[in-house]
């Protein structure tokens, strides 16, 4: 279908044409035929890179032009939110105001009342509904992106909760290919539009070693075969693809494997032609950013100089952004990543090599599970870059020829797993009901039950969980019942607004009410022990050290030592997190923290963000519970966690551009507060440099005026 044939105003057509798009592709054409531009409710399922974002844009713009109101585009990841925001900014040229919001769950974001198109995450939208802002009533068109996240064990409950509310209004749902799309479409009250079309044809295959040393065969889906030679299967196929001027994405099942594989590949990159000027610019970018440990930067620099990088959640966001952008611009030729990359931003390559189909099982030591088919489809879907590649290749590496048939049948020839509700646990279901009551204000038992029946859970499962949830939430003072109507207690409403799990809130309340004011390590351990606390890897040797440390702590912990093995593992995990955070707030150098606890800079950032949220929540819960001894300490602790400083630097880190290192530099040179900054501008400029120093002096003066 030609763009000119669309029933859209000429200025809308022009924006699409300015992107170089003259014709709609098959999924886009099918969506238009099914009434996309008439506001029809649709569920579109198609592979990665098949143009779903343009479908959403056309649906939103057409709907808003006809009906007014607001459109909300929801994604499962912050990185995707940013990506979609940049795309939708194009529509500001014809008068639509576009905004993006994520994080900071304890706010109603009143500023969004002035915007027409809002890009956000599922968690953020869920939290906004709990705050009941008036502007959200104007939202009458929802795009639910990556709806297959309903099947994600961690994110699924929130995605389902948001979907239950959103499907009461106008809706466009977008998803990767799912096997039970007709069932999901019926649940949404939407018409299904299912297609397997891809912009670049995909060749899928399995690679196995021959008896002949250093020889590997790749058997493709169309029964063709190819042989490659080399010291290692992954390296051999990577070099084969690079020799044809392709880029390569290699997926490994752990961070260590990603890093070691990248190092191995780098040793073979001498024959690959690189843009040395571009590589130098990338290396300079790495030097310029403050985020990230020096060791990981040096390792990345040595790899990038050879056209290779690794990518995993342990890296800081700034480092990941540089790697992704350099790969998009074809400056980096190979990325070795963990599967988190496949679930995130769009980063296609000619060749995708899946080095492992097994994942470490966190619950059973030494046990590995095979990856879900959906995870394979997400990884293989990155193969083939539109505009650069005529074909994409996705290869699974197996250790033995005998595995080929089984792997072919399970991953290449099979449908993905059907989507099923992830609300079927006490933690998820209780949180869901709390969120619904917070958003609605008050509901009768039948009304509340009706929301639960709108989930994907079987009615029999809802019946089991509903009574149990109501009883637990009532007994623990989250909800109250009067005249057969349920409302939240003040405590329950505060918990819902803070966007923490009710089980987390209950653990915090018991910990604070059971003890008098305590020390930092005890507060940090309590919060890390909750269901919302961050998880870190604790090795066998570390366990022994942590057990010894328990006997030498400066104060009594606020959580009793558990007897069950699983609970005790979480108890030690919480202690490791608490120790990391104690070093952080005591201004221990970041490189030292990363090395001491064997974590990456991205891990540290995630731990800090989570503990920032939990210390903030604990402070506000202590205020709600009138536990003044605790609240004073928790307020200071939260501020210190936010910036990673001792209490004496809290005034200085309020100044924009002054982080923990610069604040310490100023303090150690006699600049101990805002007044000192304003009274000693020359000394500040000498310490921080003329440009930054001047900005800091002006900002300090502004803050002083505001306080007085």
Curated annotation (Swiss-Prot):
GO biological process: DNA repair
Gene3D superfamilies, alphabetized: 1.10.3380.30, 5' to 3' exonuclease, C-terminal subdomain (1.10.150.20), P-loop containing nucleotide triphosphate hydrolases (3.40.50.300)
Function noted in UniProt: DNA-dependent ATPase and 3'-5' DNA helicase that may be involved in repair of stalled replication forks.
Top EC class for this record: isomerase
Name of protein: ATP-dependent DNA helicase Hel308
Binding site for ATP: 28, 46-53
Reaction equations catalysed: Couples ATP hydrolysis with the unwinding of duplex DNA by translocating in the 3'-5' direction; ATP + H2O = ADP + phosphate + H(+)
UniProt subunit comment: Monomer.
E.C. no: 5.6.2.4
Ligase found in the keyword field: no
Motif range (DEAH box): 145-148
Underlying gene: hel308
NCBIfam families in alphabetical order: helicase_Hel308
Motif (Q motif): 1-29
Pfam families: DEAD (PF00270), Helicase_C (PF00271), Helicase_dom4_arc (PF21280)
Domain Helicase C-terminal: 229-435
Stored CDD domains: DEXHc_archSki2, SF2_C_Ski2
């Amino acid at each position: 279908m030609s763009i000119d044939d669309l029933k859209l105003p000429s200025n809308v057509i022009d924006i699409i044409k300015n992107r170089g798009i003259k014709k709609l592709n098959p999924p886009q054409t099918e969506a238009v035929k099914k009434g996309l531009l008439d506001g029809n409710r649709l569920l579109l399922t198609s592979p990665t890179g098949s143009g779903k974002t343009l479908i959403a844009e056309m649906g939103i713009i057409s709907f808003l032009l006809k009906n007014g109101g607001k459109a909300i585009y929801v994604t499962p990841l912050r990185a995707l939110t940013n990506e979609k925001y940049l795309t939708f900014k194009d529509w500001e040229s014809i008068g639509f105001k576009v905004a993006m919001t994520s994080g900071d769950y304890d706010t109603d974001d009143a500023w969004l009342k002035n915007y027409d198109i809002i890009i956000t995450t599922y968690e953020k939208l869920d939290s906004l509904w709990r705050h009941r802002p008036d502007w959200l009533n104007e939202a009458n068109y929802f795009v639910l992106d990556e709806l297959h996240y309903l099947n994600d064990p961690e994110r699924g409950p929130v995605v389902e909760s948001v979907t239950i509310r959103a499907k009461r209004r106008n809706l466009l749902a977008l998803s990767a290919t799912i096997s039970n799309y007709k069932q999901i479409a019926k649940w949404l009250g939407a018409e299904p539009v299912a297609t397997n079309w891809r912009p670049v044809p995909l060749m899928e295959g399995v690679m196995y070693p021959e008896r002949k040393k250093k020889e590997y065969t790749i058997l493709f889906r169309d029964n063709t075969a190819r042989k490659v030679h080399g010291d290692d299967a992954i390296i051999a196929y990577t070099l084969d693809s690079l020799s044809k001027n392709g880029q390569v994405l290699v997926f490994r099942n752990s961070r260590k494997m990603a890093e070691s594989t990248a190092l191995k590949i780098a040793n073979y990159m001498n024959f690959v032609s690189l843009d040395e000027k571009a590589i130098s610019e990338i290396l300079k970018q790495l030097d310029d950013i403050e985020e990230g440990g020096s060791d990981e930067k040096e390792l990345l620099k040595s790899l990038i100089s050879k056209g290779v990088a690794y990518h995993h959640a342990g890296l800081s966001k700034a480092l990941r952004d540089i790697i992704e952008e350099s790969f998009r611009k074809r400056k980096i030729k190979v990325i070795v990543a963990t599967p988190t990359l496949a679930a995130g931003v769009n980063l296609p390559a000619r060749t995708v090599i899946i080095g492992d189909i097994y994942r470490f099982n966190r619950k059973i030591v030494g046990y590995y599970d095979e990856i879900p088919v959906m995870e394979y489809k997400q990884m293989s879907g990155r193969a083939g870059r539109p505009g650069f590649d005529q074909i994409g290749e996705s290869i699974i590496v197996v250790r033995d020829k005998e595995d080929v048939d089984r792997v072919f049948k399970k991953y290449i020839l099979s449908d993905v797993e059907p989507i099923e509700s992830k609300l079927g646990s006490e933690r998820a279901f209780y949180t869901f009901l709390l969120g619904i009551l917070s958003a609605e204000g008050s509901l009768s038992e039948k009304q509340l039950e009706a929301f639960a029946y709108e989930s994907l859970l079987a009615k029999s499962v809802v019946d089991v969980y509903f009574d149990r949830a109501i009883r637990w939430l009532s007994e623990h003072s989250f909800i109250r019942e009067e005249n057969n109507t349920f409302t939240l207690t003040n405590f329950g409403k505060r918990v819902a607004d803070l966007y923490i799990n009710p089980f987390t809130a209950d653990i915090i309340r018991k910990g604070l009410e059971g003890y008098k004011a305590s020390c930092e390590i005890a507060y940090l351990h309590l919060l890390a022990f909750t269901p919302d606390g961050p998880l870190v890897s604790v090795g066998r040797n570390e366990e022994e050290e942590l057990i010894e440390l328990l006997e030498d702590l400066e104060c009594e912990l606020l959580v009793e030592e558990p007897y069950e093995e699983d609970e005790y593992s979480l108890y030690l995990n919480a202690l490791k997190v608490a120790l990391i955070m104690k070093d952080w707030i005591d201004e221990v150098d970041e490189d030292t923290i990363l090395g001491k606890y064997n974590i990456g800079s991205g891990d540290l950032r995630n731990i800090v963000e989570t503990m920032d949220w939990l210390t903030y929540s604990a402070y506000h819960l202590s205020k709600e519970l009138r536990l003044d001894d605790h609240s004073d300490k928790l307020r200071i602790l939260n501020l210190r966690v936010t910036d990673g400083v001792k209490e004496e630097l809290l005034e200085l880190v309020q100044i924009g551009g002054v982080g923990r290192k610069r604040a310490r530099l100023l303090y150690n040179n006699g600049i101990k507060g805002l007044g000192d900054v304003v009274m000693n501008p020359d000394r500040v400029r000498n310490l921080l440099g003329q440009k930054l120093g001047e900005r800091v002096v002006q900002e300090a003066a502004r803050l002083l005026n505001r306080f007085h």
